[in-house]
């Protein structure tokens, strides 16, 4: 990844066949795996020149440039009935 990939805020993946992602340090000395069965989107983001990369499963995404700003029209919104609940689970494994 390059910082320039984050120029528009983040990188959003959807409709992935894989339900997990592994980040490996260039020298192979460290690895982290994120499993995200219950999520529609997988997002990578960082701050410019920060020493980290965030790997996050999401069920909603930031507005696109052409969004109308109306919540019910927002892509990725999950609506529950009053009093309704939903559980989402993801797992993070430190592999090395």
Please give the residue ranges for each predicted region.
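Active-site/ligand-binding surface loops and adjacent short beta/alpha elements
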Residues: 1-37
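Solvent-exposed, flexible loop/coil residues
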Residues: 7, 17, 38, 46-48, ...
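A general structural signal for short secondary-structure junctions and capping/turn motifs
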Residues: 13, 23-24, 44-46, 82
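Short beta-strand and strand-turn-strand segments in soluble, beta-rich domains
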Residues: 64-74
